[in-house]
Structures are given as structure tokens and as C-alpha cells.
Amino acid sequence: MGRSRHHNKLKEGIFEAEITALSHDGRGIAKVDGKTTFIPFTLPGEVVKFEYTFTKAKFDEAKVVEYVKKSSNRVNPPCDHFQICRGCSLQHMSTDAQIEHKQQTLINQLKYIGNGVEPENILPPLRTSNTEGYRNKARLGVRYVSKKGKILVGFRERNGRFLADIDKCIVLNPLVGDKITEISSFIETLSIYQHIAQLEIAIDDTRPAMIVRHLEPFTNEDLEKLRSFAQENNYWIYLQSKGPDTIFRLYPQGDVEPKKLSYQPAAGIDIGFEPNDFTQVNNDINKKMIKRAIELLDISENDSIIDLFCGLGNFTLPISQHAKTVIGVEGEPTMVKRAKETADNNNITNVNFYAANLFESFEDKEWFNNFEYNKMLLDPPRAGAQEVCNNIEKFNVKRIVYVSCDTAALARDAGILVNTKGYKLISAGVMDMFPHTMHVESIAVFEKI
């Protein structure tokens, strides 16, 4: 005999609650009869009237009917698409309040995930003067929607199922963000407009590059249209038919100068990169972040420093201007190759780069056994640097500067360093790499006791 399924019935009517916190994706959280209710576009301290839109055993979802009490931190969102587009989550919150919330998130996670870790000092937040047009990297979805009779280009809707119908994006660099409609209209002129899946955007100090991910071959006429569009808009256009190894530059063709996109992380250093390489999203904050990391490392001319998860040498190369020697280690061999090329091109001779998986044992590696370091910079991906922290005593470094794109991973690793490895957390703070979003970029300094 089949088992009947139990369906939770949606409560009907208008209800009232106070918002007490924000979720990881920026929705307001209210407790109603002890049950968590997520209510979008609300802020802590606000009282709202709402109606339920979805219910499950452990939580409910709802939408605002009326704001009974508004937060003093509430502002009018600067983007017309904020209600539908998932690209931003905090445009209704003042930038000061966004920073304060991110700083508190960092402190809370250090304490609870890090098992009681607290920084001796809170660093002043690194802020950008421009909270719009800051984003130089993005992946934009492309979809032909027959009901609308047009191509959509942009981020997903808040429900995550479809692309948001937008005509511009205020957080993207305006060289692309102001041209969403123009790009959409151009794609409609291509013969395979229904088979273009994604545009990967990367913008250097002077020009945008765009990788067009296509599922069917372009015709010769399409290719000519793409070249013309690139020339008219000063874009570099790349095509990608399958995996990353199929990416090639369509325009400009031939042996042109410069051969790659490039940016300056610090005065006197140019880093070349391909549009699918990892680079920081926000150039302004990146430069400030590098400057702060160098200050926090407290570098002397006799220091030997190891930079783990070094990427293209974003920190390694600027650090080399102040230290005796610097070793950069990165898991992706192509990034290591480019970092070496950059060092050569910039006539930097006191650095070396190695490829190694830093999520597994590294005790047999040349860079681990043949060099001695007294300071370390960590800039891991979201997964953090657990393997490194578990073996930190083998490096014998006195000071660690940890740059994090995930506060939970930082808190976990801080717990290892402070509670089991004899380090103290000198200072920590946030960097507003992604204004108007819940993403928290942070930096912390550990010192051997």
C-alpha cells in the first residue's frame, strides 16, 4: 500500500513580524511562532506586514505587503532592476550599513566557527570611492526567450530559474554594463543566436574582452559580424565552443601589441592575463588590498616571504619590491607560467613560482624543502587553506597575512592557527570588493606567540 505524502499548507492572510537578521543571500529573517521566515527586501530592525509565498517544514518564505517601520539604513536602490535581478542583494541598504554588516559577519564567524577566536584589533574597512561600475569580471547568461521575442543577457532572476530582463547593469564596468541592450540586439543578428549560452567578461585597464560560449558553429558571415562589432566597440572577442582549451581570440587577429590584457597591481608592475584567468573583480580595492597586505606583513629588506595560492602573482610581484626573496605557489600550472613571464617582462629577479596542489601533502616539494621563510601570505579560494594551516609549524613563519573570500573558511582556519598552532590573531577587517552584495572579502594578521 502506497504511503500518502504530507503537504504543508500555506497560511493565508496578512501577518506582521520584526526582521532580526539577514540571511547569507541578503533576505531578511523573521521568527514567527519560533519558525524562520525569509522575507526579501527587508532590513534588520524593520517591522513589516507580509503574506506567505512558500512553506516547508523548517522554514517559510514571504513577501512584504507593507513596511510598518522602516530602518534608518534603508535607501532607494540605484538600479531599476534590483527587484528582479540576482546580481545584487543589498542595494536597499546604505553603503555604510553594508560595511558594518560585513564587519560584524566577520567577527561573528571568527567567534563561532573559529571556536572563540577574536582579533585584538579591528582594521578600518577598505572602501571604494565608486560603488557603481566597479565590476571588471562577470559571467553573463544568454538566452533567447520566445515569449518576449528577444535575447536576454545578464544575471539570473532572484528565483534562479530564468535570466533577468535588464537593459543595463550599474555594477558592471560601463564599457559593458551600459551596453547590455546593444549586446543583446547584436546577438540577435547572428545565425546561431539561440545557441549562445554565455558571455564571459574581463576588462583590463583600457579595454573589455568577451568570451562568447557557443554550442553550434558560427557561419563565416557571423564571424565577420563579430569582428565588426569588436572593432566598432574596441572589444577583444574570443570564442569558446567546448572546454577552456577551445578558447581562441577572434579579434584582433595576428600578432598584435599588447598580446594580452593587463593591469597594474602596483606602480611599475604590469600583469598580463587572459580573459578566463582569475583576476580580482574590483581594480580599485585590489590596489588598496595589496598596499594593506604589504603594510601588515611589515616587510624588511631581509625578509623571505612565501605567497601561497598566488595566482598570477597579484601579491607576489608587488611584495618583491620590498622583500629579499619571494616564492609564489599556485595550483594551476598555466597561471604559474604566466606569473613567470610577468616577472621576466618586469625584470623582477628576486621571485620564483612553483605549481603545486595546496590541498594535499607538499612535504616532498622543492619550494617547501629548499627555502626558508619568515613570513607568509595566504590568498586561498573559497575552500580556504586548511591543509596549510594544519601543517603551519613546518613552515616556521612568524607572521601570516591571510586574505579571504569566504569568512567561514577563514574562521575555521583561524581556529586551527590560534587554538592549536600557537598563533594569535593580531587584527582583522573587511574589504568592500563587491559593494551591494553579501560577499565578504576580508584580511587577517596572525603572529607566532
Curated annotation (Swiss-Prot):
Q: Summarize where [4Fe-4S] cluster binds, as residue positions.
A: 79, 85, 88, 169
**UniProt keyword annotation of rRNA-binding present:** no
Species this protein is from = Francisella tularensis subsp. tularensis (strain SCHU S4 / Schu 4)
Q: Which domain of life is it from?
A: Bacteria
Q: What is this protein called?
A: 23S rRNA (uracil(1939)-C(5))-methyltransferase RlmD
What gene is this protein translated from? rlmD
Q: Where is the TRAM domain?
A: 1-66
Q: Active site at which residues?
A: 405
Per UniProt, the keywords (alphabetical) are: 4Fe-4S, Iron, Iron-sulfur, Metal-binding, Methyltransferase, rRNA processing, S-adenosyl-L-methionine, Transferase
Its biological purpose is as follows: Catalyzes the formation of 5-methyl-uridine at position 1939 (m5U1939) in 23S rRNA.
